Amino acid sequence: MTLWVLGLNHQTAPVDLRERAAFAGDALPRALESLRALPQVSEAALLSTCNRTELYAMAEEAHSLVTWLETHAPALSGYLYQHQEAEAVRHLFRVATGLDSMVLGEPQILGQVKDAWAVARAHGTLGSGLDRLFQQTFSVAKRARTDTRVGANPVSVASTAVRLAQDSFARLNESTVLLIGAGETIELAAKHLSEGRVRRLLIANRTLAHAQTLASQHGGFALPLTDLERHLAEADVVFSATAAREPLVTRAQVEQALRARKRKPMLLFDLAVPRDIEASVGELSDAYLYTVDDLERAVEDNRRGRREAADQAEAIIDLQVARYVETLQANARQAPLKRLRAFGDSTRDELLAKARQQLHNGKPADEVLEQLAHALTNRLLHPPTAALRDAALNNDLELTTAADRLFPEKPGLPTSPHSYPDREDR
């Protein structure tokens, strides 16, 4: 099996395609199990965020992964990237460190990678290969962020959106802000808003208790999601980031809110993928809609300023990729030896148990020992004997040369391993 990563992100696909390829809520474990069920796949993990959807798999080839993803979201092939082996390792290290993020060095992605690992592990789609890779990824990301300033004073998509709101509303502290959701992105937005002060903070969420917790931390008011439409007209600024599969805020709702506000402008930030706010809201006069793709331009200055730290982190990743691949190669070289030892041990234990039973049944010891010796010799030598016989028929000089090194001629031994009789156990 080969290590593959297949995916699309904010650099290769626009938000409307990314939302089609997103796996949110209960869809993620179902998708994982479906992916792992493919005969070509032995291990699988799925990373799905607002900016990327990526499949990590131990698979025979990549075509089956592409076909599977396009079954979920058609017409993606022109927007996909794929990496294998060392380049797949490098890609995951860079993603977890924040080097492949829209906001360079943003810290949320490491937690999202850990969540992807935890979900895959909980649903039994990880094996030793991917599990080892993710564990090493966490270690590399921690080191890169500790040894460089790539994660210093991080700028998130949420903080960028809040800054834009502050720039757009000279007196944001006199405005009412509505937050939809209670996940990490909304938590960050609430934190930045409470630091800058707003007149009134409303937090709407499907699970009211989560909204109440967030509201108590930041001096806001919690609302059930069912009350969203009723309070929409009160909001000067809206931030939304949920895992809903369908838009929560429609064009009709915003039109109605604008009429109730007597056309007073509204600023809306849709930080979710799939999107929470209907795209056509941006066509309304007095409604100003920003998506995560719009925010990419706003964070470009931050990206340039953090490039030096990113270069240092890239150097750490290069070194860690080389070490990880070297370890994998060393393990691969050891694998045949481990299989050989395991085969020898299991054969010995099986035949020894059989011999002990024969002695217990009263069979003469000399006869038991002779049968044990013959059976052990034949069982251990049958696989190499058969392989060497095929090599001789196929003129496989590489294998016969290796056999000469493994079985050198010595006094008292046959001149060639081919001369061992291929007898069955008695």
From Swiss-Prot:
Record field: catalytic activity: (S)-4-amino-5-oxopentanoate + tRNA(Glu) + NADP(+) = L-glutamyl-tRNA(Glu) + NADPH + H(+)
Similarity comment: family membership: Belongs to the glutamyl-tRNA reductase family.
Cited InterPro entries: 4pyrrol_synth_GluRdtase (IPR000343), 4pyrrol_synth_GluRdtase_dimer (IPR015896), 4pyrrol_synth_GluRdtase_N (IPR015895), GluRdtase_CS (IPR018214), GluRdtase_dimer_dom_sf (IPR036453), GluRdtase_N_sf (IPR036343), NAD(P)-bd_dom_sf (IPR036291), Shikm_DH/Glu-tRNA_Rdtase (IPR006151)
Gene3D superfamilies for the chain: Glutamyl-tRNA reductase, N-terminal domain, NAD(P)-binding Rossmann-like Domain
Originating organism: Xanthomonas campestris pv. phaseoli
Site feature (Important for activity) residues: H91
Disulfide pattern: none
Further comment found in the protein's record: During catalysis, the active site Cys acts as a nucleophile attacking the alpha-carbonyl group of tRNA-bound glutamate with the formation of a thioester intermediate between enzyme and glutamate, and the concomitant release of tRNA(Glu). The thioester intermediate is finally reduced by direct hydride transfer from NADPH, to form the product GSA.
Cited NCBIfam families: hemA
Pathway info: Porphyrin-containing compound metabolism; protoporphyrin-IX biosynthesis; 5-aminolevulinate from L-glutamyl-tRNA(Glu): step 1/2
SUPFAM superfamilies to which the protein is assigned, alphabetical: Glutamyl tRNA-reductase catalytic, N-terminal domain, Glutamyl tRNA-reductase dimerization domain, NAD(P)-binding Rossmann-fold domains
Domain remarks: Possesses an unusual extended V-shaped dimeric structure with each monomer consisting of three distinct domains arranged along a curved 'spinal' alpha-helix. The N-terminal catalytic domain specifically recognizes the glutamate moiety of the substrate. The second domain is the NADPH-binding domain, and the third C-terminal domain is responsible for dimerization.
GO terms assigned for molecular function: glutamyl-tRNA reductase activity; NADP binding
Gene symbol of the encoding locus: hemA
Function: Catalyzes the NADPH-dependent reduction of glutamyl-tRNA(Glu) to glutamate 1-semialdehyde (GSA).
Subunit structure comment from the entry: Homodimer.
Protein name: Glutamyl-tRNA reductase
N-terminal signal peptide: none
Ligand binding (substrate): T49, C50, N51, R52, S101, E106, P107, Q108, Q112
UniProt-listed Enzyme Commission number(s): 1.2.1.70
Binding site residues for NADP(+): G181, A182, G183, E184, T185, I186
Region of interest (Disordered), ranges: 404-426
Active site (UniProt): C50 (nucleophile)
UniProt xrefs under HAMAP family: Glu_tRNA_reductase
Any one GO BP annotation for this protein: protoporphyrinogen IX biosynthetic process from glutamate
Swiss-Prot/TrEMBL keywords: NADP, Oxidoreductase, Porphyrin biosynthesis
PANTHER family: GLUTAMYL-TRNA REDUCTASE
